[in-house]
C-alpha cells in the first residue's frame, strides 16, 4: 500500500517473496525447508524497515513499524489506537475546548489564557485606565454641578477635567453629558440661562462644544426672525420681485414666478434695441433672446395657429417674401382691430413671447424706403397676436427658416393666381433691407405697388393672406443671420425656376 499524501513510501519490495504463511496450502517439507531462511529474512527485513522508517518518521514510529513487520504484517502499517500519529495530525482542526492530544512543544508555545486576562480588549478588568461607563453614581456629581450652575451650564475646560477625574470618565463623556443635559432642558422649556453669542466677553474661554451650541442657537433665532419677516412682508416681496430672502430656494421660486418683473425689464429693453439693430443689418443678432423665444414657444408645435386680424390700411410697401405655405392661417382685411385691452389680459408666462413677436413700429421702419406712402407702416396696435399664435409662429419659423427652401420645393402651391405677377427676381431690388438683410438696398415704389395686390379673386385669397401673415411674422419674430442674403438669393432662384416651369 502507498500513502504518498501522508509521506508513506511503498515498502513492499523490501520483503522477500518467501514469508511464513505465504504458502499456507503447501506441504510441511516446504515449510520446514524455508523456516530458518524465513526467520533470517524477517530480521533483515525488520532491520531494513527500521532504517527506512527512522529516516522518514523518527525512532518511535520506526520501532513500532519494525515490530509490526516482525510479527508478520508485511507492508501494512499498524493503525493501532495507541499510536498517536493521527491525533497529532488532526490536532489543529480540533476545537479549543476538546482535550485533544497536543504536542508538548505546541502546548508550551500556546498556553491556555489565564482566567484573569481580559481577552476582548486592551484593558483588564481591574485596569484603572479603562474608561468607565456613565452610571447613576457618576452622573449624580454632574447633576449636582448642573443644578448649582443653572444660569451658566457651560463648564470650562478646567471644570470638565475636574469632573472627569471625580467621576472617572473621559472629557468626551463629560462634554457629551452636559450637551445632552442642556438639550433636554431646552426641549422641556426649562432654560434658565440666556443664550449667548460667540462674540461675548467670555466667548474665548469656552470650548468648541460651547461654540457649536451657541452657533446652533443663533441659527435657530435667525430662522425664527426670518419666518416672522416672511409672514409680515411675504406678499410685498412677491409683488416687487426685486428683493430676495436669505433662503436660496425662495429666491429661485421668486425668479420663476416673476419672469417679466422689474428685474428683467432692462434686459428686455436692451435686447429689443439689439434686435432692431439686427433688423437694419447693423449688428449681429442676440442669441439669448432667440433662446428665450424658443423656450417660451416649446410645447406648442402641434397647436394650429389662430386667426390673425389686421386693421384696414393702405397697400403695404413691403414685398411679400417667399415663405412657407400655411393653410390654417387666414387674413380678413375687413375685420376690425382687436381692443388694446386684450394685451393686458394675457398671462405673465407669455410676456417674453409677446416681446419677441411685437409688431414693428416707426423706429424699426427702414430708412431707405423713402418712396413709401405714409400709411405703409402698420401701427403697433394694428397687429395683435395672441400668445399662442405668437409662440407657435416663432417656433414654426425656427423649425423651417428661409435657408431651407430646397427641402420643400417638392410641395408647390396648388396653382398660380389668376392676377398679374412679376418675376421673383425683382425681390432683389424692391424688398426693404430688413427682409433681405442687405444694408444698401433701396425700395422701388413701382415694383412695390405692383406687388401690393389690392384685390384678388377668391381663388388666391388664402394664399395671399398666408403670404401677408408670414411677411408680418418675418418682420416681427426673427432677425437676419449673417448668411441671410445668400439664402434669399437661393430662394429667389428656386422660385424663378418653379415659375418658369
Swiss-Prot record:
Q: What's an example of a GO molecular-function annotation for this chain?
A: sequence-specific double-stranded DNA binding
Q: What PANTHER family does its record include?
A: IROQUOIS-CLASS HOMEODOMAIN PROTEIN IRX, IROQUOIS-CLASS HOMEODOMAIN PROTEIN IRX-3
- What does this gene product do? Transcription factor involved in SHH-dependent neural patterning. Together with NKX2-2 and NKX6-1 acts to restrict the generation of motor neurons to the appropriate region of the neural tube. Belongs to the class I proteins of neuronal progenitor factors, which are repressed by SHH signals. Involved in the transcriptional repression of MNX1 in non-motor neuron cells. Acts as a regulator of energy metabolism.
| InterPro entries, sorted | HD, Homeobox_CS, Homeodomain-like_sf, Iroquois_homeo, KN_HD
Looking at the record's lineage, which domain of life comes first?
Answer: Eukaryota
Q: Where is this region: Disordered?
A: 190-381
**UniProt similarity note:** Belongs to the TALE/IRO homeobox family.
Where does this protein reside within or beyond the cell? Nucleus
Q: Where is the composition biased (Acidic residues)?
A: 210-220, 227-258
**Protein's organism:** Homo sapiens
> Looking at the UniProt record for this protein, which Gene Ontology cellular component terms does it annotate, in alphabetical order?
axon; chromatin; cytoplasm; nucleus
This protein is called: Iroquois-class homeodomain protein IRX-3
**Is Aminoacyl-tRNA synthetase one of the keywords?**
no
Which controlled-vocabulary keywords does the entry list? Developmental protein, DNA-binding, Homeobox, Nucleus, Phosphoprotein, Repressor, Transcription, Transcription regulation
Q: Which residues bind DNA?
A: 125-188
| Database matches in Pfam families | Homeobox_KN
- The Phosphoserine modification is found at 323, 326
Major localization class: nucleus
Gene from which this protein is expressed: IRX3
Statement: the UniProt record of this protein carries the keyword Ribonucleoprotein: no
Sequence ranges of Pro residues compositional bias:
324-339
One biological process term in Gene Ontology: neuron differentiation
